[in-house]
Each structure stands twice: as structure tokens, then as C-alpha cells.
């Protein structure tokens, strides 16, 4: 099933010829459709979703069992073939689906909840389809990221989605330190049994007073949004939390150059070094962030290093 006007859909390319060989000249006529699914309340399903499920030649689902429950709730039966498409089989399944698309099939991709590709399977298939010259379109739907941002009460004019943090404590701290000075609002997904440890780590890196919102079970019966400082929220989460979690964290405060002394410059360089940056790059990044010459940051780091050596020498170490 082709979309009206699909034969004129432009796909620009920098290679000679201007347009990659594709459906415009009859080479590729298939279409990949990314469809959003409810994050909780099935009534939030996009109206077009049922039509796409009924009309697609192939439905690729993150979990075919959850897809079955969704189609039953929507009162629709997929007319095409249903296949699984999840993290464990993405590599093998992607070429198969691209071949179907190249042959003219309309392939619908859905995940368990929300939009495909957003911390869910999808982007590999999109990239492969684009490379092959396949038309890619979407049926926009619910998003836990945008819903949590809207409910958080924090600035949402600029934000950064960080997905899930690493499970290991050390790796989690490293990842958080990488964005310790990020001024945009941060959004994370987290499992309920790790929430208290994650919030405690955030409080350690960002500060206990940094504002945040924990959004739980969005659009479901027991939806809850808990707002407060990271320290307060970490203590609350220690009592046990259930459900699907999205955490929204306020960005770092905007500190003017006059507030950043030598000690703070050195601290920021160390944070970046601990996150894996080389000293030269860390110094350049801090200088650009604060708005001071790189030489000023370099001198502060050298002075701190020399002071530490003198202190160790005087202590007889």
C-alpha cells in the first residue's frame, strides 16, 4: 500500500545526480512507517495507528505479544505478516526488512511504548532504509520524554535526552560527570529498583538542591509526579518505588565568569578528566564554557598541581 503522493517524495543526496536512485524512478517503492504507541492509556493511540496496522504488508514489533494485546484493544487485525524486531535481533532482521522495503512493501515499525528509535529499536532500520533510498515517514504518537518534560515544572525550551544510565555505579558516575555542567534540562529513563541509587548519584554529582521531577506511571491509573531537590527525592525513592520511571533534572546554573575562580576551573577540568577527556581537551572545553582564555585555565591547573606537590613534600610524603 503506497501513500498518496509517494511518487514525488524528495530524497536529496550530495552525490552526483542530486537524488539517490529510489522510488522516484521506480527503483524503490516501499515505505517504512514509524508509529507511536500508547505509553500507558490505550486511548492515547494515534487515530492513524489502527489504519496502518490494518494496511501494512509487514508489522515489525518489539514484542509481538504486546502488539497482539494492542491490536485487540484497538479492534483491528493486522492483514500483513507480523515479525519481531528487538535489540537482540536488530542486526539480523534489519537487512531482511530493507529487502522487503526495496521490493515495494509497506513496513510498519512499532515498539512496546512510545516512538520507535527513542531509547528503543528503530534508528538502525531507519539508517539502512535511508541508505537504500526507501521513503521513511511517521505516525507521531505518545512520548514519555515529552510528557515528563511538560509535567516537570522545569524549563523545557532546551533539553537533552540521556536515555538509561549504566547499571554499574562507577560507570553511572562517569556518565553523570560528563553532563555536570550541562545547562539544558536533562531527561533520563530508569528502572524502579535502581531509582534510589541513581538519584543519590545525581545528588552527589549535581548537588542535593538541584531541582528534579520523578514521573512515574505516566498516563496510567497511578500516575505520579514527585518534584523536589535531588537529595530529597533520593531519600523518598529509598522507601521503594514501582512502575515505569522518567526523571527530569534541571540544568546546571548559569555562572558568569566572575563567579569562576581558579579552584573552580581546576575542579571542572578534573571532572572532565575523570570522564575520560585528555587534559588538553578538558582545558579547552572549560575555557570555552566559562569564557576565559585557555592559558588562564592551564595556569590554574599547573598552580594546583605544584601546590599539591609542595604540600606532599612538606608532609614528608
Report the location of each language-model feature:
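Short active-site oxyanion
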Residues: 53-59, 133-137, 185-186
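General beta-strand structural signal in soluble alpha/beta enzymes
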Residues: 61, 138-141, 188, 214
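Conserved helicase motor
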Residues: 83-91, 165-168
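A contiguous loop/helix-start segment that scaffolds small-molecule binding in enzyme catalytic cores
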Residues: 3, 7-14, 18, 22-25, ...
Amino acid at each position: 500500500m503506497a501513500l498518496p503522493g509517494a511518487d514525488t517524495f524528495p530524497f536529496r543526496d550530495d552525490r552526483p545526480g542530486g537524488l539517490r536512485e529510489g522510488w522516484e524512478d521506480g527503483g524503490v517503492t516501499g515505505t517504512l512507517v514509524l508509529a507511536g504507541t500508547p505509553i500507558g492509556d490505550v486511548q492515547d493511540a494515534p487515530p492513524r495507528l489502527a489504519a496502518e496496522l490494518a494496511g501494512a504488508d509487514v508489522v515489525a514489533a518489539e514484542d509481538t505479544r504486546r502488539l497482539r494485546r494492542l491490536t485487540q484493544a484497538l479492534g483491528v487485525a493486522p492483514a500483513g505478516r507480523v515479525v519481531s524486531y528487538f535489540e537482540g535481533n536488530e542486526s539480523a532482521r534489519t537487512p531482511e526488512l530493507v529487502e522487503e522495503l526495496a521490493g515495494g512493501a509497506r513496513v510498519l515499525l512499532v515498539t512496546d511504548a512510545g516512538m520507535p528509535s527513542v531509547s528503543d529499536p528503530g534508528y538502525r532500520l531507519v539508517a539502512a532504509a535511508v541508505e537504500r533510498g526507501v521513503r521513511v515517514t511517521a505516525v507521531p504518537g505518545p512520548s514519555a520524554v515529552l510528557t515528563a518534560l511538560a509535567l516537570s515544572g522545569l524549563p523545557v525550551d532546551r533539553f537533552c535526552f540521556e536515555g538509561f544510565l549504566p547499571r554499574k555505579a562507577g560507570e553511572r558516575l562517569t556518565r553523570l560527570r560528563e553532563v555536570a555542567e550541562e545547562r539544558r534540562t536533562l531527561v533520563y529513563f530508569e528502572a524502579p529498583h535502581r531509582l534510589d541509587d541513581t538519584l543519590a548519584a545525581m545528588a552527589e554529582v549535581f548537588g542535593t538542591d538541584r531541582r528534579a521531577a520523578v514521573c512515574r506511571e505516566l498516563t496510567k491509573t497511578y500516575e505520579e509526579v514527585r518534584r523536589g531537590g535531588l537529595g530529597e527525592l533520593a531519600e523518598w525513592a529509598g522507601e521503594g518505588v514501582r512502575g515505569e520511571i522518567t526523571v527530569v533534572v534541571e540544568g546546571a546554573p548559569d555562572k558568569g565568569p566572575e563567579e569562576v575562580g581558579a579552584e573552580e576551573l581546576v575542579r571542572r577540568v578534573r571532572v572532565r578528566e575523570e570522564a575520560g577527556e585528555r587534559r588538553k581537551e578538558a582545558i579547552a572545553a572549560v575555557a570555552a564554557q566559562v569564557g576565559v582564555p585557555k592559558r588562564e585555565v592551564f595556569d590554574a591547573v599547573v598552580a594546583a598541581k605544584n601546590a599539591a606537590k609542595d604540600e606532599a613534600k612538606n608532609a614528608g610524603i
